[in-house]
């Protein structure tokens, strides 16, 4: 949508740079201005609709982050590729309500899933005795949202995290 708006502005600029000899009554210019205004309204409507859907999807979880599964069972590397292709991220809960929203997905499907824990994480939810590097280099969350060290080769539920900053 932004590409269309930019293209319209470019056309308007080209038209203005070429002068008004070809359009002495300003009909073409007015038509371009009307089209641009229509595109701006459409963009505003789409943005509003998108935000409404996003707010509705995140309402129940109390988190602005969405945790979505395709119900596949994969290892960590496959998860990374799937989330990247979907323009999402491997889950990385930064707050308790993020972790609860993530755990709700796992509980609903009765499966565990990978997550990543940043070096400077302010929030963690390690299970007792964790992290345990001997268990593996990756981290998984159980259906209650507790975190456990695990092998990156384990096949777990594919869950990707999506968040929107506008």
Swiss-Prot record:
Coiled coil segments of this chain: none
Single Gene Ontology MF annotation: carbohydrate binding
Signal peptide boundaries: 1-19
Record flagged with keyword Transmembrane: no
Keyword Manganese found: no
Source species, domain of life: Eukaryota
Main location: secreted
Domain C-type lectin: from-to ranges: 46-161
Name of a matching Pfam family: Lectin_C
Disulphide-bonded residues: 83-160, 138-152
Keywords, alphabetical: Calcium, Disulfide bond, Glycoprotein, Lectin, Phospholipase A2 inhibitor, Secreted, Signal
Protein location: Secreted
CC per GO annotation: extracellular region
Transmembrane segment boundaries: none
Expressed in which tissues: Expressed by the liver.
Glycosylation sites: 122
Function as written in the Swiss-Prot or TrEMBL entry: This phospholipase A2 inhibitor binds directly phospholipase A2 in the presence or absence of calcium.
Entry's family note: Belongs to the alpha-type phospholipase A2 inhibitor family.
Assembly information from the UniProt record: Homotrimer; non-covalently linked.
Protein name: Phospholipase A2 inhibitor
Taxonomic lineage from the root: Eukaryota, Metazoa, Chordata, Craniata, Vertebrata
